[in-house]
Amino acid sequence: MDAAALQYENQKLVQQLEAQKSKMRALEGKFKELRDEQCSYDNTLICLNKMWNQLIDDLVLLGVRAGGDLNGLQALDHEEMSEESLESCPSEEIFLFRLLNSRNFRNNDDSSLSKLVEEALALRYSTTVTLMKSLQEAFAVQQARSESLSLALNGQNSSEDVIVALENHNDYLKEVVDNLRQAVSIINRKHEKYLDEIEAFKNNQSRELHEVKCLSGELEESMAELEESRRKLAVLQLQTGGGSLMNTSAPNGVNGSVSTDKSSDKGMGWRDLKDAVEEAKTLAANRLFELHETQEDNLILSKQLEDIQDQLKDENYIVTSKPYTILSDQLHHLNAEIERYRGLVEVLQNEKDQLMQKEEEMLAKAESVDAVQQSITTYKAKIEDLEHEIQKLMAEKNDLEIKAEEALQDSGKKDFKDEIHVMAASLSKEMELLDNQMNRSKDAASEALALREEADYLRTLLAKKIDEQKEISDRYNTQVTEIKSLKALIETLDQEKQELQFIVDMLGKECSESRAISEIEESENRARKQAEYLRKCLEEHNLELRVKAANEAETACQQRLSIAEAELEDLRAKVDASERDVMKLKESIRIKEAEVDGHISEIETIGQAYEDMQTQNQHLLQQVADRDDFNIKLVSDSVKMKQAYGSLLAEKNMLQKQLQHVNSSLESSKLKITSGEEQMKTYVAQAMKSSSENRHLAISLERTMLEVSDAEKELKWLRSATGSAEKEYEINQKKIAELKMELERERNERIKLEEEYEEVKNEVSELTSETEETTIQKLQDEIKECKAILKCGVCFDRPKEVVITKCFHLFCSPCIQRNLEIRHRKCPGCGTPFGQSDVREVKI
C-alpha cells in the first residue's frame, strides 16, 4: 500500500474518531444532566422521607408522653433501603421505590405499578392517621382526667373523695412514668444498636480505605508499566526507523544502485510497524480499560464513603431530632418534678430541723441558767473558803503574837530555836495556801474563758434569731399586703353589689308603680283626642314627615325598652354572680383572718422569745463583763500574791541564812566556851560574848516584830479583799433582784400590750361598723338623689312621663298640659319653644 492511501485511511479514521468523540461528549452531557436530575430527585426524596419519618416519630413519642400504649414504638423502626435493591431497581422507579419503601416495583409492569403505588401510599397514610387518632384519644383521656381532678379539687367534695382522686391521679402518673421509662429504655437500646452499626460502618470504612490504598498502589504500578511499554514502543519505532535507513543507505554506498528487493523490504517493514502499532494499541486499550475500571471502583468506593458519612450525619441527626429532644425534655421535666418534691421534703426537714434547733436552744438556755447557778454556788463556796482562810490567818496571827510574847518572856536559847522552827513550819503552810489560791485563780480564769465561749455561742444564736425574726416580719408584711388587696377587692365588690341592688330596686319600683286602669283609660282618651287633633293638623298642614318621625321614635323607644329589659336580666345575673363571689371572698377573708391571727400569735410568741433572749443576752453580757473584771482582779491579785510569795521566799532565805549564822555562832561560842574552860579566861570576855549574843537576840526580835507587822498588813489586805468580795456578792444579789423586777415589769407591759391590743381590736370593729353605717347612709342619699332625678323638675312630686322632642327634657304630664294651654309654650328647663306635636309620652 502507498503512503498516500495510508494517510487517507488515517484521516478517515481520525474523522470517524472525532465524530464518535463528539457523540460520546453529547451522550456524556445528557448522562450528566440525567444524573443531576436524579440527584435532585433523590435529595427531595430524602428530605420528604426524613420529614415523614420525623412526623411519625413525633406522633409516637407524643402518644407515649400523653399516656398511650407502647405498641406505637414499633413505628420508630424505619426500614432503610439497601444499595443492592436500589441498583436492581430501574432509574425511573427509584423515587417511588424510596418513597413507599417497597421492593416489588422491579418485577411489575406499568399497569400494576400504579396500583402498587396507590396501595403503598394508602398504607403509609393509614398508619399516620391511626397514630393521629391514637394521639387524639390519649389527649382526650388526659383532658378528662384533668377535668375530673379539677372538679374534685374545686368542687364541694369531702376530703376523703379528694384524697381518693389524688391517689388515682398519682397511680396514673406512676403508670405514665413507667411507660416513659420503658420508652426511654427502648430508645436507648435502639441508640446502642445504631451506635453498633456506626462502629461497623467505621470499621468497613477503614477496611475500604485500606483497599483503596492497595488499589491506588496497583494503579500506580500499572501506570509505571504503561509508561515502560510506551518507552519500549518508542525505542522499537526508533530502531525500526534506523534499520530501514541503514538498509537503504548501505546498498547505495556499496553497489551504487537501488536493489530489486526494495519494495518488498519496505512492505515488510510497514507490516511489522503496523503489527507493532496494533499490539501497542491493544495494550494501551487494555490498560485504559483497566484504568477506567479502577476509576469506576474508586468512584464506587467514594460513593460508599459518602453514604457512610451521610449515615453518620443521620446518627447525629437522631441525637438532635425532635423525638430525642422531646424525651430529653420529658426527662428534664420529671427530674424537675423530682427536685420539686425533694425541695418540699427538704423544706419539711428544714422545718423539723428548726424545731429541733429551737428545742436545743431552749435546752441550751436551761443549761446556761444551770451553769450560771453552778458558777454562783462555786463562787459562794470560794467566798466561804476565803473566809475560812481569813479565820485561819487570824488564828495564826494570834498564835504568832502569843509566841512573840512568849519569846520576849523566855530568853532561853532552846525556846528560841523551837520558835524559829515553828515560824518556818507556819511559813511553809502559808506558802502551800498561797499555791492553792494560785490554782484556784487559774481555775477561775479557765471558767472565765468558758463563759466567754458561751457568750460567743449565745451571740451567734441571737443573730440567728434576729434573722428568723426578719424573715417572719417579711412574711407578715406580705400577708398584710395580701389582706389589704383582698379588702380592697371586697370593698369594690360591695360597691358593685350595692349599685346593682339599687338599679334592681329602681327597676322593681318602676315595674311596681303601674298605673290604675282608670288612668290608662284616661290616657287612652287623651291619646285619641290628641290623635284626632293631630290628624286634623296633619290634614291641614300636610305633616306626614313628623308622623313618620314619631313612629320611628316609638320604635326606638320600644327597642330601648327591650334593651333595658335585656340589661336588667344581665344585671340580675351579674348580681347573683357578685353575691356568690362575695360569699367566696368572705370565706377566704375568714380563712385569711384566721391565718393572720395565727401569724400574729406566732409573731407575738417570737417577739416575746426574742425579748427574753435579749434580756438573757444582756444579763449574760453583764455576767461576762463582771467575770472579766473579776478575772482581771484575780490576775492582779495573783501578781500581787506572786510578789508577796517572792518577798516571803527572800525572807525565808534570809531567815535560813540567819539560822545558819546563829548555828555557826553557837558553834563558835561552844568552841570559845571550851577554849575558855581550857584556857581559864576571865569572865569579862564571857560577859562581852553574852552581851553580843543579847544584841543578836534583840536584832532577831526586831526582825520577828517586822515580820509580825507584815503579817498584820497581809491580814488587812485579805480583810479588804473579803470585804470587796462581799460587796460584789451584794452587788450581784442586787442585780438579780433588779432583773427579777425587770421581768415583772416586762410581764406587766405584756399584759398592758395585750389589753391595748384588745382595745384596738374593739376600736377596729367599731370603726368597721361605723364605716358600714356611713356607706349605708351614702347609698340612701344616692337613692334619694336618683329618685329626685326621676321626678319632675317643675313640681318635684310626680314622676317624669312626657318628653319634649326638641330639647329631650322630661317632665310630668300635668305640668306640660299647663304649658300647652298657654299660647307661648316654652320648655321649663331650657326655654325652647315647642308645639303639641313635640310632646311624647315616655315610660320609665
Curated annotation (Swiss-Prot):
PROSITE patterns: ZF_RING_1, ZF_RING_2
GO biological process assignments: chromatin organization; flower development; innate immune response; leaf morphogenesis; protein ubiquitination; seed dormancy process; vegetative to reproductive phase transition of meristem
Keyword GTP-binding included in the entry's annotation: no
Pfam families (alphabetical): zf-C3HC4 (PF00097)
Enzyme class label: transferase
GO molecular function: protein homodimerization activity; ubiquitin protein ligase activity; zinc ion binding
Disordered: region residues: 244-269
Catalytic activity: S-ubiquitinyl-[E2 ubiquitin-conjugating enzyme]-L-cysteine + [acceptor protein]-L-lysine = [E2 ubiquitin-conjugating enzyme]-L-cysteine + N(6)-ubiquitinyl-[acceptor protein]-L-lysine
GO cellular component: HULC complex; nucleus
Residue stretches in coiled coil: 1-38, 160-240, 290-604, 640-670
Signal peptide region: none
Localisation per UniProt entry: Nucleus
Zinc fingers (RING-type) by residue: 792-831
Keyword ATP-binding: no
Other noteworthy facts: Plant silencing HUB2 exhibit early flowering, increased plant height, and increased panicle and grain length.
Domain notes: The RING-type zinc finger domain mediates binding to an E2 ubiquitin-conjugating enzyme.
Family, similarity comment: Belongs to the BRE1 family.
Record function comment: E3 ubiquitin-protein ligase that monoubiquitinates H2B to form H2BK143ub1. It thereby plays a central role in histone code and gene regulation. H2B monoubiquitination, mediated by HUB2, modulates transcriptional regulation of anther development, likely by promoting histone H3K4 dimethylation (H3K4me2) in the chromatin of the key tapetum degradation-related genes C4, CP1 and UDT1.
Descriptive protein name: E3 ubiquitin-protein ligase BRE1-like 2
Organism of origin: Oryza sativa subsp. japonica (Rice)
Gene (name only): HUB2
